[in-house]
Swiss-Prot record:
NAD(+) binds at residues 126-127, 204, 250-252, 270, 316-317, 338-342, 349-350, 398, 590. It is an enzyme of class 4 (lyase). One of its GO terms (biological process) is L-histidine catabolic process. NCBIfam families: PRK05414.1. It comes from the Eukaryota. GO terms for molecular function: urocanate hydratase activity. Belongs to the urocanase family. This is Probable urocanate hydratase. Its cofactor is NAD(+). It catalyses: 4-imidazolone-5-propanoate = trans-urocanate + H2O. Keywords: Histidine metabolism, Lyase, NAD. Pathway: Amino-acid degradation; L-histidine degradation into L-glutamate; N-formimidoyl-L-glutamate from L-histidine: step 2/3.
């Protein structure tokens, strides 16, 4: 990788078109719908030309118009580097500000072809999780970061670099917003228009905040979910038990690895041979077949042997569920789905009866018919799931809007006693499993060793084990100790499980006390020189405080506030002035555009006392914020956790709820 070339002026001289790179065999995003009027298409080109010096307008106006017609979006492919991107050792970046070098490393990792779903379209995961809207923005952002000082802050509006603004060393080096819309215009239909115009983008969660660490990020969460789903069924061991699901993409590709780690038989449907083969070649998917009879035979064989294995079905998930529903016996104990149903009609879900290629063509050539086929397939899929669930399978929604889109397609999924429109017969994994884990304050904390050295990551793993050992012996409830034990097992086996894809990164579900201790210990490792370069700490937006999402992260909030977004917005504001190196606030992520508000952060631990101070101050807000909100909604585990935190954190005093007597309320007349 030619790192210095990433920081040159892309207009003087004008960069050559990266012909060799464009010709490489990588997965590409489907053509996007472009239902713009002639005037709006002119506006889209005009908007892109704003970045370009006037002398290049004639040439690039034609290029941009051709891209808009061909791909449904102006990606500015000319400005894409003519080589593969990846996260190099931070010492090779050499920006004027060390914190900015670390941010550049994180951006490059999000566009690594081993990590990103559609690297040339700047999509990291989820089908449309953009890092930037176009490659011109990529170039300008890297130039700004390379030259900035620690008295400046870079501001990004949905990928667009607004510029560098004066600030202080304690301020964030970068603030990011993605997809912030006037609420009544935050619809999926209008998103297509405004993305085509180049004025907003869908950053998913860690795609647009530059904190993605490859599928490892969701392996841990999926492992925890599968283990706890088994516990809900009274299973101490998942040996010989079958978990059926769908998706082997950027995030969902974690499922076969998680199934093996959990000790069960994972069966995962995937219609894209590129996505499936990527996981097979990576070693995360053991075997695969296009033949449903072979799939069923493998399931029966490994159920009998009680051996863990990951099995891929190269075909449509609807066909898999319907075939399994034909079996007289229940072959499936656990079921879910991780297709990208936040984006159901533009590549997030592929209907039965069409090939992958036919679907990619029809979704733009005949979107009305394609939508009908998708919804018919969802009806068929949930009907097959109903049949197997009636035999004893435990099925849950993985927060990808599966049940929501089935309901929108016409399926009757509400419970008989439902008091709202989100109380489905099948639970969200947040309601049954992860909600309580978040309420305890545990969530997907992560770190990146910017040296790029495996030995540095190994030392952080060992340090994390020691900290967990200390925490599990403190005065905490047994259910909290169980979380510590689960997470210690994860970190002990992390290197053996070969989870690193891209940067030298690790994820660990941790609570407030754990995160504060980890940040302090990591900063000391950098200060002492035991770790050879700065460590970036971050988390998924899908966390205790980071996301307001009534169909996922806050689906177990029952006081009527699940459809509000104060928590996520306040979290980003609070992180920004408490010490984050960068912060991000997004519309969408997980369930989809208009249905979620979420945010994240990054902190660079450089071994300084300032870094230690900032990390402690910020982490003592970033977790308790969400625990307090969950406590206020009535969650008992959150109430215990926040009262315990009040005794440990100076200055922390929260408002605790007083529960009303149910019989008193029933006597009231309205």
């Amino acid at each position: 990788m030619n790192i210095p070339s990433l920081f040159v002026d892309p207009f003087s001289p004008l960069l050559e078109h990266p012909t060799e790179q464009r010709a490489k065999n990588v997965a590409h995003a489907p053509k996007r719908p472009c239902n713009l009027t002639q005037t709006e298409k002119m506006l889209a080109v005009r908007n892109a030309l704003r970045y370009i010096p006037k002398e290049h307008h004639v040439l690039l106006a034609t290029e941009f118009a051709e891209e808009l017609n061909t791909y449904g979006h102006i990606y500015g492919y000319r400005f894409m580097p003519n080589f593969d991107l990846f996260a190099p050792p931070v010492s090779e970046i050499g920006a004027h500000c060390e914190q900015a070098s670390a941010i550049i490393l994180m951006i490059l990792n999000n566009l690594d072809k081993r990590v990103a779903q559609f690297p040339q379209e700047l999509v990291t995961y989820g089908g449309n999780g953009q890092v930037f809207s176009n490659w011109i923005q990529f170039r300008l952002v890297l130039r700004y970061l390379y030259t900035m000082t620690d008295h400046q802050t870079l501001v990004l509006y949905s990928g667009h670099p607004l510029g560098l603004f004066p600030s202080t060393p304690d301020s964030p080096r970068m603030t990011v917003t993605n997809g912030m819309m006037i609420p009544s215009y935050s619809t999926k239909e209008l998103y297509d228009k405004y993305f085509a115009l180049g004025v907003t983008q869908y950053g998913q969660m860690t795609a647009g905040s530059f904190c993605y660490i490859g599928p490892q990020g969701i392996v841990h969460g999926t492992t925890i979910t599968v283990l706890n789903a088994g516990r809900r069924m009274g299973l101490d061991s998942l040996a010989g038990k079958v978990f059926v699901t769908a998706g082997l993409g950027g995030m969902s590709g974690a499922q076969p690895k998680a199934a093996k780690i959990a000790g069960c038989i994972g069966v995962i449907a995937e219609i894209s041979d590129t996505a499936l083969l990527k996981r097979h070649q990576q070693g995360w998917l053991d075997v695969y077949s296009k033949d449903l009879e072979e799939i069923v035979n493998w399931i029966k064989e490994y159920r009998e042997k009680k051996e863990a294995i990951s099995i891929g079905y190269l075909g449509n998930v609807v066909d898999l569920w319907e075939r399994l529903a034909e079996e007289p016996e229940c072959l499936v104990e656990l079921g879910s789905d991780q297709t990208s149903l936040h984006n159901p009609f533009l590549g997030g879900f592929y209907p039965a009866g069409l090939t992958f290629e036919q679907s990619n063509q029809m979704m733009t050539s005949d979107p009305v018919k394609f939508k009908k086929l998708v919804q018919n397939s969802l009806i068929r899929q949930i009907a097959a799931i109903d049949k197997i669930a009636a035999k004893g399978m435990y099925f849950w929604d993985y927060g990808n809007a599966f049940l929501l889109e089935c309901q929108r397609a016409g399926a009757n999924l509400l419970r008989e006693d439902a008091q709202d429109d989100k109380s489905f017969r099948y639970p969200s994994y947040m309601q049954d499993i992860m909600g309580d884990i978040f309420s305890m304050g545990f969530g997907p904390f992560r770190w990146v060793c910017t040296s790029g050295k495996p030995e540095d990551l190994r030392l952080t793993d060992q340090t994390a084990c020691k900290i967990i050992d200390e925490l599990k012996d403190t005065d905490v409830p047994e259910y909290v100790k169980q979380q510590y034990l689960d997470n210690k097992k994860w970190i002990e086996e992390a290197e053996k499980n070969k989870l690193v894809v891209g940067s030298q990164a690790r994820i660990l579900y941790s609570d407030r006390a754990g995160r504060v201790a980890l940040a302090s210990a990591f900063n000391e490792l950098v200060k002492s020189g035991k770790v050879s370069a700065a460590i970036v700490i971050s988390r998924d937006h899908h966390d205790v405080s980071g996301t307001d999402s009534p169909f996922r992260e806050t689906s177990n909030v029952y006081d009527g506030s699940a459809f509000t977004a104060d928590m996520a917005v306040q979290n980003c504001i609070g992180d920004s002035f408490r010490g984050a190196t960068w912060v991000a606030l997004h519309n969408g992520g997980g369930v989809g555009w208009g249905d979620v508000i979420n945010g994240g952060f990054g902190i660079v631990l450089d071994g300084s006392s300032d870094a230690a101070r900032r990390a402690e101050g910020m982490l003592n807000w970033d977790v308790p914020n969400g625990v307090t909100r969950r406590s206020w909604s009535g969650n008992a585990k959150a109430q215990e956790a926040i009262q315990r935190a009040e005794k440990q954190v100076d200055g922390l005093r929260v408002t605790l709820p007083v529960e009303a007597d149910e019989e008193l309320l029933k006597k009231l007349k309205f």
